[in-house]
Amino acid sequence: MEKLQKTVDEWKAMLDPEQYNVCRLKGTERPFSGKYNATKTDGVYHCICCNAPLFDSTTKFDSGCGWPSFYAPIADSAMVEIRDVSHGMIRTEVTCAKCDAHLGHVFPDGPPPTGLRYCINSVCLDLVPR
């Protein structure tokens, strides 16, 4: 997959301030504030920065954490996992494989069949209904 690269000014021109803060500066939206937290619409969630498909709605579940949660990405190649030791914690950050947008984190406390919980910021996503 060819990487999508843009300048800071190009990202700022195409993203709103919250999207830029979360996707490009590794911020986090407030829990329970995102538009996709409780959404049950059937479709595919794409990266807001580059439109790459990231998650299928069939893998979305209510984890109660305040952010959209999925038990698997649409493909293993859709994202990159990075060790994150910020804020005094050890976590695994997930970023878009195509454009390096920060999406959220993955935790080992999800449901079967994977046992994983991809905790993703809504502002990083664009849901395309089926």
Swiss-Prot record:
Residues 8-130 form the MsrB domain. The active site is at residue 119. It catalyses: L-methionyl-[protein] + [thioredoxin]-disulfide + H2O = L-methionyl-(R)-S-oxide-[protein] + [thioredoxin]-dithiol. One of its GO terms (cellular component) is cytoplasm. The keyword Oxidoreductase applies. GO terms for molecular function: peptide-methionine (R)-S-oxide reductase activity; zinc ion binding. Its cofactor is Zn(2+). This is Peptide methionine sulfoxide reductase MsrB. The lineage of its organism: Bacteria, Pseudomonadati, Pseudomonadota, Gammaproteobacteria, Pseudomonadales. The gene is msrB.
